[in-house]
Amino acid sequence: MAKTVEQIAKDLNLSVTTVRLVLGGKAEQYRISVKTQSRINEHVERFGYTLNHSARSLKLNKTETLGLIVPNISNVFFATLAEKLELRCRRSGYQLMISCTYNDVDYENKLVKALMARNVDGLFIVPSTLENQQHHLRQIQKPLVLLDRDFGFTDNALVESHNEAGGDELARNMLAESKTPLWFLVGDTALPSITDRLNGYLQALKAAGIHHREWVIEGPDNTPEGGYALMDSLIDSQGVPQAFIASSLPVLEGAIEALRTRTGTVPPHINIGTFDEHPMLGFLPNSVWSMQQDEDTWAEKAFELMQRAIDGEAVNETAKVDMKLVKRFRQ
């Protein structure tokens, strides 16, 4: 098993400094005897040599680790983003520690404290609330890149999708199919990304001469359970819809389950829109429009901002990543 400088010094009854100078090629400069050099080199040849990363980290105040805090990885977008970001960090020599908050605001703060105690070099965080975001900005003295949610009141580094433009493009394309009302099932407008998607949808309606929000059904939860409740309520009040948009894949999952429960199937005539992309959408019998987030660009942008902050630059940039419309038409 390879040995550290400290272990080599102990084995040979030499000082750590002497061993380090020999291994660093400075033996002649500091007049270390040929005999001592030979002892050290023979020992290394026999056992090998490895860096003591703990000691190196203390000396440099750098651990080459980064932290990522997301709501959960059952959400396809966050799972994919975590994977892409981990791979991007690895390419540059960093390990990424991934933690989930499950939207527990107190636990999120505990995770931040725990990762800071491990002396990570920087943190990527999807904040649960404005209060959490403000807490992190006050408490974290390391490079910080916020992800997905812009609660405002900060000029910190941030990466998010262009959700308003995505909502507008999605609604315009679905309205062009002339199936109305085009309902919007909205889970948790306290999340800035969801509010932006709703605003984009309303913008598309106005462009089509529709100046009301009567087709919007809101609920408090961005979850499958929340989506089920929204669709259940819509069917109770209006019947099975001709067309609808779900504000996220979790909301869509619940909405589809409600349709299956109430009608015994997913009626193929319904036009369905959603945010985020998943191959399983192709198995629906419906025409489906989805706004795909670009996780590869997200990972590149987030790491770029983090690296600049680690290098000492004051980074206050917001990177907005374009979304891509994916269409699946059924005859």
Regions of interest found by a model, annotated:
Residues N61-R172, A176, L234-V240:
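Alpha-helical recognition/docking segments in bacterial nutrient-uptake
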Residues V120-P127, W183-V186, I217, Q238-S248, ...:
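Periplasmic-binding protein-like
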Residues M1-K62:
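N-terminal helix-turn-helix DNA-binding module of bacterial transcription factors
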Residues V16-L21, L58-N72, P181-D188:
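Short beta-strand segments enriched in small/hydrophobic residues
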Residues T180-P181, H212-W215, T265-N271:
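Short acidic capping loops at alpha-helix termini that bridge into adjacent secondary structure
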Residues P71-A79, S99-D106, R149, V159-E169, ...:
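Hinge/beta->alpha junction and helix N-cap segments in small-molecule ligand-binding domains
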Residues D232-Q331:
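Flexible loop/turn connectors
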